Amino acid sequence: MNIKPEEITSIIKKEIEKYEKDIKTVDSGTIIQIGDGVSRVYGLDNCMQGELLEFPNNVYGMVLNLEQDNVGCVLLGEEKGIKEGDTVKGTGRVVEVPVGEAMIGRVVNALGEPIDGKGPISTSQTRAIEIPAAGIIDRSSVNEPLQTGIKAIDSMIPIGRGQRELIIGDRQTGKTAIAIDTILNQKGKDVICIYVAIGQKQSTVAHIFNTLTEMGAMDYSIVVSATASESAPLQYMAPYSGCTIGEYFMHQGKDVLIIYDDLSKHATAYRAMSLLLKRPPGREAYPGDVFYIHSRLLERAAKLSKELGGGSITALPIIETQAGDVTAYIPTNVISITDGQIFLESDLFNAGQRPAVNAGISVSRVGGSAQIKAMKQVSGTLRLELAQYRELEAFSQFGSDLDADSSRRLEKGKRLVEVLKQDQYSPLEVGKQIIILYAAVNDFLSDIKVSDIKRFEKEFLEYVDTHHREIEKSIITGKTLTDEIKSMLEEAIVEFKKIFLQEA
């Protein structure tokens, strides 16, 4: 057998040409310090802010500090088994969460992983948790109402789709109750609701989930949970993850309602992380950029322009105050970022006025332009009349004799306060709210005892529903109170009052 040297060389050449060697370069570093959920890594020269790092034992970390010779990062899992000297790899990716229709009805953690025991979430799409907010050109003004189903709010502090309205008050004043009622009221209104629990007890989150399930609200809701037992980095990430999940739906042209419960605990988690990363503390030991963590989150709530599909995110952040002090650092920060606040007072709550909304210092800066005309017509004088009532009430406690006009205002105020009371988990449709508020504002309840107002409201709305259904229909379709609707409504009130007073 003759083997020609040329043939051998050509075969070798072909083999060499075919050979491809993939060189994989990995940016890696060494742990020089670890503890308290925080690590310092040396040698990651090409690292970026917010990058995911891969630690041993399949644990990930997020870069927050870029320093001259090392990077500071927070761990997103257990630090058990990880020690100084271990190798850490850079991934070149930032933190992302899964998004999509499959998220609806699920309970997920801050990383978007399911924690409700219903199996994996079937979605392949992911989005980064930190995305710049929509620009001025991409937005349109707030012009559609988002009904909460709560009379005191929809009448005096209206909320529009795309607005950011702060709910602020001491602990145990009904802040979460308002948020949950608002979610329940979105049933059948094509609004996706996201409830973000930050630093709450696990039992509280379980109770909220059970309530939403029983009321059929989980069909259009998502719960993002980072409870008190989870690490500070996960509590810090939760609202951004919730917002990213909501932005997916907003860009589909849908309306989203997102509740952050609460941002006080979010700031506390960020403070803990910052102090462990040895960032210089400022006022109340918060780091200097604590304003920015909330502003960049809440600026992502928007009403998009028609060209971008006209979707919206309405944000209801919650802040817990200490003894009604709204001048503390975090409350003043969030008040200045949002488009208004609903202020809840423990004194009103303890006096039996629930929801305990203080109409005097609560305000909605943009919601008025989204309120329907019929509601504007009935609630125009409501805030003023309540303010006058509060003043007269304080004055009348001294026992001095009041003139007839003051007595009339005092009696009317008592009835208005009674009408604005509402049970939890019983949101009212806007048409029904307008009907009962019209009766209260226009002095039709002056001959009804204050103790009977609640029963009168319930029975009157049932009466209108069975005998005069066209009134509510006309209000909802026309969105304004014409003279014709007013006369129909007044007739119905007079008719029912005769029946009610005879029974009484």
From Swiss-Prot:
Site (Required for activity): S362
Record's subcellular location: Cell membrane
UniProt enzyme class: translocase
PROSITE patterns recorded: ATPASE_ALPHA_BETA
The keyword Ligase appears for this protein: no
Reaction(s) catalysed (UniProt annotation): ATP + H2O + 4 H(+)(in) = ADP + phosphate + 5 H(+)(out)
Keyword field: ATP synthesis, ATP-binding, Cell membrane, CF(1), Hydrogen ion transport, Ion transport, Membrane, Nucleotide-binding, Translocase, Transport
Entry membrane topology: Peripheral membrane protein
Pfam families per the UniProt record, alphabetical: ATP-synt_ab, ATP-synt_ab_C, ATP-synt_ab_N
Binding locations of ATP: G169, D170, R171, Q172, T173, G174, K175, T176
EC code: 7.1.2.2
MF-aspect GO terms: ADP binding; ATP binding; proton-transporting ATP synthase activity, rotational mechanism
InterPro entries: ATP_synth_asu-like_sf, ATP_synth_asu_C, ATP_synth_asu_C_sf, ATP_synth_F1_a_nt-bd_dom, ATP_synth_F1_asu, ATPase_a/bsu_AS, ATPase_F1/V1/A1_a/bsu_N, ATPase_F1/V1/A1_a/bsu_N_sf
Database matches in SUPFAM superfamilies: C-terminal domain of alpha and beta subunits of F1 ATP synthase (SSF47917), N-terminal domain of alpha and beta subunits of F1 ATP synthase (SSF50615), P-loop containing nucleoside triphosphate hydrolases (SSF52540)
Gene Ontology cellular-component terms listed: plasma membrane; proton-transporting ATP synthase complex
Subunit structure: F-type ATPases have 2 components, CF(1) - the catalytic core - and CF(0) - the membrane proton channel. CF(1) has five subunits: alpha(3), beta(3), gamma(1), delta(1), epsilon(1). CF(0) has three main subunits: a(1), b(2) and c(9-12). The alpha and beta chains form an alternating ring which encloses part of the gamma chain. CF(1) is attached to CF(0) by a central stalk formed by the gamma and epsilon chains, while a peripheral stalk is formed by the delta and b chains.
Its biological purpose: Produces ATP from ADP in the presence of a proton gradient across the membrane. The alpha chain is a regulatory subunit.
Entry similarity comment: Belongs to the ATPase alpha/beta chains family.
Annotated HAMAP family: ATP_synth_alpha_bact
Name the record gives this protein: ATP synthase subunit alpha
Lineage: Bacteria, Bacillati, Bacillota, Clostridia, Eubacteriales
Gene field: atpA
